[in-house]
Amino acid sequence: GTEEAKKVLRQHRIEKLPLMQDGRLRGLMTTKDIKRLEQWPDACRDEKGRLRVGAAIGVKDTLDRARELVSAGVDVLVLDVAHAHSEIVIQRLKELKANFKVDIMVGNIATAEAAKDLIEAGADGLKVGIGPSQVCSTRIISGAGVPQLTAIMDVVAVAKEYGVPVTADGGLKYPGDLVKAIGAGAN
């Protein structure tokens, strides 16, 4: 653990600690690494201690971009479109699930029906929010959208049945908005 590593670094007055496994060098741990681990103990890391990385992709050139991102080591792909409850998004999601072994989050949506359709197509996570923020005009231009708190509750009602996490995307202007989103069931 980190306490043992700190002890070895101090004892030998060194700044880098080689990490060995089966007689082979697997990495180095520095005092800065230990400080980061202590400062952000809840950071989302993979089994090698690296921060997890997600990358957004759209519906154009989806497979090519996804292939490059997955080969670079991305942990999650986010199929990110303004209004994700559409045939093209469902089709791209199915293609991604058939070709890659990473989690795929899909959004943005605002209804229980969208949640059900995307989960059944393979979504591992959902992003909720169509036009709830000041910079997004999707709801105004398209006429499609639901107030953020209602959208979260509607999507969570379905996602919970499948064990799929929900992320509130937008509409979080004041500290109380985050509390409301979590209270409505967003992860």
Residue ranges of predicted features:
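Conserved, mostly hydrophobic/aromatic
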Residues: 53, 79, 126, 155, ...
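Alpha/beta catalytic cores of nucleotide-metabolism and tRNA/nucleoside-modifying enzymes
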Residues: 3, 7, 101, 121, ...
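Catalytic cores of alpha/beta
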Residues: 64-72, 110-128, 168, 172-187
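Glycine-rich beta-to-alpha transition loops that act as phosphate-gripper elements at the mouths
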Residues: 1, 20, 55-61, 105-114, ...
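Short beta-strand/loop segments at the ligand-binding rim of alpha/beta enzyme cores
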Residues: 46-55, 95-110, 125, 158-170
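The conserved cystathionine-beta-synthase
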Residues: 1-13, 20-21, 36-38, 60-70
